[in-house]
Regions:
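WD40/WD-repeat beta-propeller blade N-cap
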Residues: 8-14, 59-66, 102-109, 163
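A conserved positional marker within WD40/Gbeta-like beta-propeller blades
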Residues: 3, 11, 38-40, 63, ...
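Blade-level signature of beta-propeller repeat domains, shared across WD40, Kelch, NHL, RCC1
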Residues: 115, 134-162
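Loop/turn segments within WD40 beta-propeller blades
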Residues: 18-28, 63, 70-76, 113-120, ...
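Conserved strand-to-loop turn within each blade of WD40 beta-propeller repeats
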Residues: 32-36, 80-84, 141-144
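WD40-repeat beta-propellers
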Residues: 17, 39-44, 87-92, 147-152
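A structural motif specific to WD40 beta-propellers
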Residues: 2-5, 50, 54-57, 97-100, ...
């Protein structure tokens, strides 16, 4: 294949790259997580049309390597995991993009996935913030060999561990 773009905003190794789900809010975006503790958000249409290869946002808050990023629900919320033992949920609909929930574990979190029943992305709009509906579930895979399932309790609160 022919290279059509080269994104150079991360100075350290990139560990995860993912696209938003198709046919949802922000489906024209991709997310890049790096050892520089940053997640960059890119507009795929701007890259494809050679308008801009610059990230539209840089999400900061993790204190270690970003190991995984996954879009869930209606595409407005993404989950990120890190070597700092924290999974974070981010609301792409806020400006600037806000971390709306954190969940800490005892070991680095290598991966995250949304439960298929949670992929509908039910939410309630309140001003500029999004409330994740209680009951949305995601799973994490950690350095201790455990897979944990969480159910969100809503924006700004910790998730309940259900497994």
């Amino acid at each position: 294949g022919k290279q059509v773009a080269c994104l150079t905003e991360h100075a350290q190794p990139v560990r995860t790259v993912t696209f938003a789900r198709p046919n949802v809010s922000y489906s024209d975006h991709m997310f890049v997580g790096s050892d520089d503790r940053t997640i960059t958000v890119h507009d795929v249409q701007a890259i494809r049309s050679h308008v801009s290869e610059t990230a539209v946002a840089a999400l900061q808050g993790h204190r270690g390597w970003v190991l995984d990023v996954q879009a869930g629900g209606n595409g407005r919320v993404i989950a990120s995991t890190c070597s700092d033992h924290v999974v974070r949920l981010w609301d792409l609909g806020t400006s600037p993009i806000e971390c709306i929930m954190t969940q800490t574990q005892k070991t680095p979190i290598w991966g995250v996935a949304w439960h298929p029943d949670s992929m509908e992305g039910t939410r309630e709009d309140m001003g500029s913030s999004t409330l994740m509906a209680a009951g949305h579930r995601f799973i994490t895979g950690s350095d201790d060999g455990h897979v944990r399932m969480y159910r969100s309790a809503g924006t700004g609160t910790r998730a309940d561990e259900v497994v």
